[in-house]
């Protein structure tokens, strides 16, 4: 993949040098995310961490795009983050280790009290002509169809709890897409570890997609759909993984419904099933290894969400995740306020309880505030 990255970077310079009349666009944002953590005192004492701490993150994102003629374009996006607080200082729950490091990442500052990471999470060249689209480089390959948990998202799995990553991760890959007749399309995408094909078509007023892939050591077959049942949306996707070495088989699937009222209120509910979920670890939600086979650490997961614009500038909402195996509840209330056309304020919290000794015991609570300026 290093050769692919080298070729990509050289291609970017070639496009910029060979074509004098190139359209350049840019945008981005600057945000400050504060978090205040409150941990269960007994558990905190047992694992020898404080029961309260706070962290700060400053995030500058810069997106650039080049266009030449009708067929060629390129994109590069920089993600620059500064970290301070207890999680950075103590490398809490492997905080530093979780920061992705590769050829296009640079830890510019690694001091005891502060850290800075500069990451290129989009860097690709794209060619389009007629029904064809070819893209090479670090990109988002969004194959998920269900709202929350996506077993078809082989290249860029979403972490539901990482709400601050608005653009979501990218992957180094080559993707070829062809748009056929009658709302059909075919995609092929490959990188070092994944080779996959996706076919989309429409039938019975539903959009369907089929997936065939080699995903690390697994062969994958998948089916997904999206459509309407009366006025409610109905989506789902399932993937069947067969390990080429151990022959272990795993089914990962999710279904969901959503509904919007005329006053703007939005409801959504979904369920995720994993046939080979790992042994339960309540803190896997905090520090889990997200993948298409492991979008959540439990076998059965239920999510319910409601959003409502109480004012044209104010949106409130709440998400609830429930695991019935050990009766864990995760609640995530949220409020966003549009201060101006370019400045937004968000206040949110993530709270987790577990049923123990005939009562729900609080495990952890985190309060977030984020101020963001978009340019």
Where are these regions (language model features)?
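Detector for outer-membrane/organellar transmembrane beta-barrel domains
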Residues: 203, 228-321
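Hydrophobic, lipid-facing positions within transmembrane beta-strands of outer-membrane proteins
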Residues: 56-62, 118-123, 170-174, 195-197, ...
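Transmembrane beta-strand segments of Gram-negative outer membrane beta-barrel proteins
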Residues: 21-45, 74-76, 182-186
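Transmembrane beta-barrel strands of outer-membrane/channel proteins
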Residues: 28-36, 76-80, 136-138, 188-190, ...
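Repeated loop/turn-to-beta-strand initiation elements of outer-membrane beta-barrel proteins
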Residues: 70-74, 131-134, 182-186, 205-210, ...
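Outer membrane beta-barrel
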Residues: 65-184, 354
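Outer-membrane beta-barrel "beta-signal"
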Residues: 306-308, 335-337, 343-344, 348-349, ...
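Residue-level signature of outer-membrane beta-barrel architecture
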Residues: 22-24, 64-68, 126-129, 178-180, ...
């Amino acid at each position: 993949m290093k050769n692919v990255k080298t070729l990509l970077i050289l291609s970017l310079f070639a496009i910029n040098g060979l074509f004098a009349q190139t359209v350049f666009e840019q945008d981005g944002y600057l945000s400050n995310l504060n978090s205040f953590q409150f941990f269960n005192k007994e558990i905190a004492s047992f694992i020898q961490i404080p029961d309260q701490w706070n962290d700060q993150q400053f995030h500058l994102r810069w997106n650039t795009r080049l266009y030449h003629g009708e067929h060629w374009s390129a994109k590069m996006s920089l993600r620059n983050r500064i970290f301070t607080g207890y999680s950075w200082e103590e490398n809490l729950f492997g905080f530093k280790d979780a920061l992705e490091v590769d050829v296009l990442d640079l830890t510019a500052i690694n001091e005891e009290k502060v850290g800075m990471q500069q990451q290129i999470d989009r860097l690709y060249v794209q060619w389009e002509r007629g029904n064809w689209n070819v893209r090479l480089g670090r990109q988002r390959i969004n194959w998920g169809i269900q709202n929350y948990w996506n077993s078809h998202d082989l290249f860029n799995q979403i972490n539901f709890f990482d709400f601050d990553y608005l653009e979501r991760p990218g992957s180094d890959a080559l993707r070829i897409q062809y748009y056929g007749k009658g709302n059909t399309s075919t995609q092929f995408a490959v990188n070092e570890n994944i080779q996959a094909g996706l076919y989309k078509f429409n039938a019975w007023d539903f959009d369907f997609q089929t997936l065939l892939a080699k995903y690390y050591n697994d062969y994958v077959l998948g089916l997904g759909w999206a459509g309407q049942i009366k006025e409610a949306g109905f989506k789902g996707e399932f993937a069947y993984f067969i390990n080429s070495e151990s022959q272990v088989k795993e089914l990962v699937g999710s279904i969901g419904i959503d509904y919007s009222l005329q006053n703007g209120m939005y409801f959504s509910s979904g369920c995720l099933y994993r046939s080979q979920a790992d042994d339960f670890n309540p803190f896997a939600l905090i520090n889990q290894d997200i993948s298409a086979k492991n979008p959540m650490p439990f076998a059965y997961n239920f999510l319910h969400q409601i959003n409502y614009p109480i004012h044209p500038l104010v949106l409130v909402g709440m998400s609830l995740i429930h695991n019935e195996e050990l009766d864990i509840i995760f609640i995530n209330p949220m409020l966003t306020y549009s201060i101006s056309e370019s400045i937004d304020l968000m206040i949110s919290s993530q709270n987790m309880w577990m049923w123990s000794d005939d009562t729900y015991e609080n495990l952890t609570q985190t309060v977030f505030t984020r101020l963001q300026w978009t340019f």
